[in-house]
Amino acid sequence: MAKIIGIDLGTTNSVVAVMEGGEPKVIANEEGGRTTPSVVGFTKSGERLVGQVAKRQAITNPENTIYSIKRFMGRRQNEVNDEMKMVPYKVKQQGDHIVVEAQGKDYTAPEVSAMILQKLKKAAEDYLGTSVTEAVITVPAYFNDAQRQATKDAGKIAGLDVKRIVNEPTAAALAYGLDKKKDETIAVYDFGGGTFDISILEVGEGVIEVKSTNGDTHLGGDNLDQKIVDWLIDEFKKDEGLDLRAKGNEMALQRLKDAAERAKIELSTALETEINLPFITADATGPKHLVKKLTRAKLEQLVEDILQRSIEPCKKAMADAGVDASKIDEVVLVGGQTRMPRIQEIVKQLFGKEPHRGVNPDEVVAIGAAVQAGVLAGEVKDLLLLDVTPLTLSIETLGGVATPMIPRNTTIPTKKTETFSTAGDSQTEVEVHVLQGERPMAGQNRTLGKFKLSGIPPAPRGVPQIEVTFDIDANGILNVTAKDTATGKDQKITITSSSGLSKEEVERMAKEAEAHSAEDKAKRDEIEARNQLDNLVYNIEKMLKENGDKVSGEEKAEVETALADAKKTLEGTPTAEELNAAREKLTASSHKLAEAMYKANAAAGAAPAGEPAPGEPQAEQKKDDGVIDAEYVDVDEKK
């Protein structure tokens, strides 16, 4: 049976895992890393780089290197004004969705995420030795419907059938609770690169039930990095009188971001670090260098207001779950940012206990996704996951009021039907306006979709009976139906295009991604064939130089012609097939050369006339000269 992989598609890093022999296993990427930076770079030559190689060239190519794309998934421009200021690449609105620009071409957020997913998919295929077409992908628990749908679209573009979207804290609980026999109430505190989530769950006896979830999709490690960058810029301006925010300093800003992230990571274990950036900029007096010491205490002072933003969602989640901190048995930390000592202190103060450190915060979400994939594939038995919807789902009623249909933290899948009526006399159609959010008025919440139910028989207001049904599946994807009970007419909407991409656009992008994947393979094949031919040319030239005098002019000329042809091929832009053909031709010539050399060597080794033939006493005596006695060792016995 084909494997279903589990993917943690993160803001900063992504991880892929799979169930093997009943155990979840994290799969290393092509570079050997267990985590893959969620970075995509576009070079001038049209090459697309993903992961560590993309991250490495970000400093010299900041405007065409896309990172933290998860912050733009399923979002509109007015929702990401702060995020847009944090990145060096261009972000703009295009229709209903956001696009980023790289090398003059526009890409949607799901398209860029799909490039990261393709790399993880390939790593899994290389490891498993078979094609992979199905996956479970995780999202922050507080992702809304549009963000979830954008994630599913990214999977589809990457050639993956997304069998389930799982909340990240829930996935962490799956990994944590896999072997738990006793009942426990756990809190999963997930502070990632771009989002913050808190979930309260009950774990035990093969059942993992989410009681509540809360969070902030504008809060993450990126915000801490930005605080350090802002501090460095202000300090540099104070010292040198130069503003690194000025236009033309894009490369310097990228260097600052990289240095800020490194310093933040170092200060999780060290008390002080030095940020040293030579030649950060220059003025009329010459080059300028940035050298600054940053202590852990100063870092904590800089970011304290950001860290405090994680406390209120935790309190709300506990209130919604009907528990207080004393009832929480374990606090599981997720996300690399939770290695920061100050975050661990905040968690300890909030929940009154030391956080659990038995899981790897970078890998636990992908491991949980692999466990859920194992459940869907039938590899993991006796494990039931009961998740919740993170935000209230409502419809707009008279006066612009948001009337809740499914409250937040309702266990999913779920279905709810309510009866509504018309607001005016002789009204023949009603508009159903579907909303998501916690605000009392429709205009303050996010629109998921609108549709009209027409053909209602004219009647006084309040008489027609319109049944509205909200149905959420296990992925948190919503279907809404409105039905006139008198006529039986109904209208249905599946909130699936809320990522801003139509089905046709997703399919087009999937085809483009597939074509690009084929291009990538052709490029890899071409590089491999080029390297093989280049090596062969080098070796034959060396052999000809050392042994050219031992073969006839005709044989030598034939090889030199083949060498010239091979070099000419290498100078152009040949395909892998053309390179392989040149290599085969050169190999055939080299075989003839080798054969001629062996013959020449054999002839040179024949005994000259008048000397004793081999086997005669003198020859035997000569052969024995310089022989050293040694003990015989049977190598096999040593094995």
UniProtKB/Swiss-Prot annotation:
Taxonomy, superkingdom: Bacteria
InterPro entries: ATPase_NBD, Chaperone_DnaK, Heat_shock_70_CS, HSP70_C_sf, HSP70_peptide-bd_sf, Hsp_70_fam
GO molecular function: ATP binding; ATP-dependent protein folding chaperone; unfolded protein binding
Pfam families: HSP70
Record's compositionally biased regions (Low complexity): 601-618
Expression triggers: By stress conditions e.g. heat shock.
Function: Acts as a chaperone.
Family named by the database record: Belongs to the heat shock protein 70 family.
Name the UniProt record assigns to this protein: Chaperone protein DnaK
Species, as recorded: Acidobacterium capsulatum (strain ATCC 51196 / DSM 11244 / BCRC 80197 / JCM 7670 / NBRC 15755 / NCIMB 13165 / 161)
Species classification: Bacteria, Pseudomonadati, Acidobacteriota, Terriglobia, Terriglobales
